[in-house]
């Protein structure tokens, strides 16, 4: 099972609830609750203050997010591959909780908009543009650098 953004969080939630229904999961930039990292200034204020402000302004979504994250942390047993980026405005600076999950392989893609020293671009048949958002790093051609990691993960889950 794999997903990006809210699909990434859904992948984690699915695998925590139904570990016997799929061989594994790959999550890309998990996030379902808006641009929390940027809107609540996580870099400047820290995680605790930012989340307190989010809860004050949006208690229902905050509590649902916390409930889902706790469920994932407490129940996820299958090895999962998760990609995050610190410049992801959604949850890029709020992903450290993934490190608490046994079997989780979290990959912080890069600290900037390059992977392995190469600028990230998206290409079409007759267009090309730089990837300008951390949330979109997995759609850049440079993300192919991680193909061996992904293929090794898939191979490890199909044995």
Question: Model regions: which residues?
Answer:
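Primarily recognizes the serine-hydrolase "nucleophile elbow" in alpha/beta-hydrolase
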Residues: 1-45
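Active-site-proximal beta-strand/loop segments in catalytic clefts of secreted hydrolases
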Residues: 2-5, 28-31, 83-88, 109-112
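Extracytoplasmic/periplasmic, Sec-exported soluble proteins
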Residues: 6, 72, 138-142
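Sec/Tat-exported extracytoplasmic proteins
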Residues: 18, 29, 84, 154-158
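A general secondary-structure boundary signal
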Residues: 28-29, 95, 120
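The feature captures the conserved acid-bearing segment of alpha/beta-hydrolase catalytic domains
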Residues: 32-106
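C-terminal catalytic histidine-bearing segment of alpha/beta-hydrolase fold enzymes
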Residues: 104-159
